[in-house]
Every structure is written in structure tokens, then in C-alpha cells.
């Protein structure tokens, strides 16, 4: 009995000694058999192969022909002719509509005017900096009651977007692929004029240009297109005069230089003379501290 007590006591002392030794060991010592904590996220990323996204649409001939028949719809034809400046329906935006139809998996029987306007609105959402021009789509898609119905239209847009798995970004290469199938079709000749590229500063806008007009009304007059001699949706000039004042506006997108400064006919300069261009900086404050007017300064 005494022997058993001594053995038990010795075992407990030995065990406590082992614990003390382990507890006081080197702080960086690794216990035998211990494994490093696994990081599942890193392991999954290292094992998962790189995904190469295929941008090829693989459009079938019957899909292209169904889309071209849709473009010949009377309502869509009137809408496209209304967009004389090609701000909301140039060739790239129309190509995006066809790409959206393919990504959404629409049957050719679903190539309808409503789906066209929904997809075109989404394309403008994705690509255009000017947000207000696309509102012209509302009265064409919804009719006279568009102010009450446009929230439902926006829900249709969201549903269409979800049907594409939210893949609304279409590269220029993809658009060029769509247009390359039938490069002579009239829809792919709708080049937007160079003077309508980019965004416009807010204080230069005419608010009347942004109010939706809808069917039955003539498009708003565009000063830039009038100066450039562009009068139809194809961007072709109907002005046959060859005055120097008008010839400066007859550049195509490929011929236009980013360093070219476009002036109105009233400001044309003599090409045989040398001119110095001075840019004036507008003063931030109207008066000096003593009450005298500030002068403009050359930059």
C-alpha cells in the first residue's frame, strides 16, 4: 500500500516536471508531430487553374438575320432616324445589343422591340458618360405614359442584366467581331461624328436638349452638326458647297487629329500668316483688396 502511494506520487512529480520542461522550452521550438495551420484560401488559389475567358460570341446566321429583321421594324427605324447625332444608337451600341441578346440566351422569337430598347438602355448605361440622352428611349419603348411606366422598364433592365449573369461589359474587339460578319450592313455604318465624342461640361449644356421627345416630334436642332454639315443619321453632309469655312468640318474619325483646334468660321485665321495663341486665365476674384479691378493674365 505504501509502495503504491510512493509510485503514484513519483509519477505525479515526474509528470509535473515534464509539463514544466515543455512549458519553459524555447519559444520557437516546434513540438514533434505538430503541423502548420492550413490557409484554405491560399491553397485553393494555388491549386485552381487560371481561367481564360472566351470573348467569342459564336453568332449563328439565323441569329444575325433575326436581329437585322428586328432593326427593320417600323418603330425602331423611326427611333434610329430620330437619333440624328448618333448619341444613343451608333454602331457600337447596336453591336452591344446583339451581344447582349447572345449572352442572355434569347431565342430568335424573343428578338422584340422591347428587348431591343431594354438592351440599348443598358448599353448606354455601360458606355456613355452623358446620362440624360438615353432617357429618349423611354417614350419610344413605353409610349405616352412613360413617366408612370419607366420604373417597370428599369426593372426589366435589371432582369435582363441578371439573365446575362451581369456580364454587361463588351469590349471594342467583341463589337468589331459582331460587325465583321456583315460589314456592309447599314447598321454598322452608323459612325458617330467626332464632334460628339466625349462628355460636355454642365454649364455648356442646353437643358432643352435632354427632355425626351418621343415619336411624332422632330429631333432637337444640333448646332455642332449644323456647322459640320451633318444632317442625317448616317453622318453624310447634304451641303455640296465647297467653301473653306465648311471644308474644315469634313474630317472623318480617322482623319481627325487630336491636336487640331476647331474654330468657328468667324474666327478662321489666315494660313499664310503666323499667329500666337495666348490662353487667358480668368481671375478668381473680381477686385483687388484696394478696390481696383483685376486684370487677366497670360498663362
UniProtKB/Swiss-Prot annotation:
The keyword Cell cycle applies. One of its GO terms (molecular function) is cyclin binding. One of its GO terms (cellular component) is nucleus. One of its GO terms (biological process) is mRNA processing. Keywords: Cell cycle, Developmental protein, Meiosis, mRNA processing, Nucleus. It is found in: Nucleus. Signal peptide: none annotated. Residues 61-193 are annotated as: Speedy/Ringo box. It comes from the Eukaryota. Belongs to the Speedy/Ringo family. The C-terminus is required for CDK2-activation, but not CDK2-binding. Stimulates oocyte maturation by promoting meiotic G2/M progression in resting oocytes, via activation of the MAPK cascade and cdc2-cyclin B. Also activates the kinase activity of cdk2; this activation does not appear necessary for oocyte maturation. Necessary for polyadenylation in oocytes. Interacts with cdk2. Interacts independently with cdk1 and with the cyclin B proteins ccnb1 and ccnb2, but doesn't interact with a cdc2-cyclin B complex. Prior to oocyte maturation, the mRNA is found in a complex with dazl and pum2 proteins; pum2 dissociates from the complex during maturation. This is Speedy protein 1-A.
Amino acid at each position: 500500500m505504501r509502495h503504491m502511494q510512493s509510485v503514484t506520487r513519483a509519477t505525479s512529480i515526474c509528470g509535473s516536471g515534464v509539463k514544466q520542461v515543455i512549458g519553459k522550452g524555447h519559444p520557437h521550438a516546434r513540438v514533434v508531430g505538430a503541423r502548420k495551420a492550413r490557409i484554405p484560401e491560399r491553397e485553393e488559389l494555388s491549386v485552381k487553374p487560371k481561367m481564360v475567358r472566351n470573348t467569342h460570341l459564336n453568332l449563328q446566321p439565323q441569329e444575325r438575320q433575326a436581329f437585322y429583321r428586328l432593326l427593320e421594324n417600323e418603330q425602331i427605324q423611326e427611333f434610329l432616324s430620330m437619333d440624328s447625332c448618333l448619341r444613343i444608337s451608333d454602331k457600337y451600341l447596336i453591336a452591344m445589343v446583339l451581344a447582349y441578346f447572345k449572352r442572355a440566351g434569347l431565342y430568335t422569337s424573343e428578338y422584340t422591340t422591347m428587348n431591343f430598347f431594354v438592351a440599348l438602355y443598358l448599353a448606354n448605361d455601360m458606355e456613355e458618360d452623358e446620362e440624360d440622352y438615353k432617357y429618349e428611349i423611354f417614350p419610344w419603348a413605353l409610349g405616352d405614359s412613360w413617366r408612370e411606366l419607366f420604373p417597370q422598364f428599369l426593372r426589366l433592365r435589371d432582369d435582363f442584366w441578371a439573365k446575362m449573369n451581369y456580364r454587361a461589359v463588351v469590349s471594342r474587339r467583341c463589337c468589331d467581331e459582331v460587325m465583321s460578319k456583315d460589314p456592309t450592313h447599314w447598321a454598322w455604318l452608323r459612325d458617330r461624328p467626332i464632334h460628339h465624342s466625349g462628355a460636355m461640361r454642365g454649364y455648356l449644356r442646353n437643358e432643352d436638349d435632354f427632355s425626351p421627345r418621343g415619336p411624332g416630334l422632330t429631333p432637337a436642332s444640333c448646332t455642332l452638326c449644323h456647322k459640320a454639315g451633318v444632317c442625317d443619321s448616317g453622318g453624310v453632309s447634304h451641303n455640296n458647297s465647297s467653301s473653306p469655312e465648311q471644308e474644315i468640318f469634313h474630317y472623318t474619325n480617322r482623319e481627325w487629329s487630336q491636336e487640331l483646334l476647331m474654330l468657328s468660321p468667324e474666327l478662321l485665321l489666315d494660313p499664310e500668316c503666323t499667329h500666337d495663341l495666348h490662353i487667358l486665365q480668368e481671375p478668381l476674384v473680381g477686385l483687388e483688396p484696394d478696390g481696383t479691378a483685376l486684370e487677366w493674365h497670360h498663362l
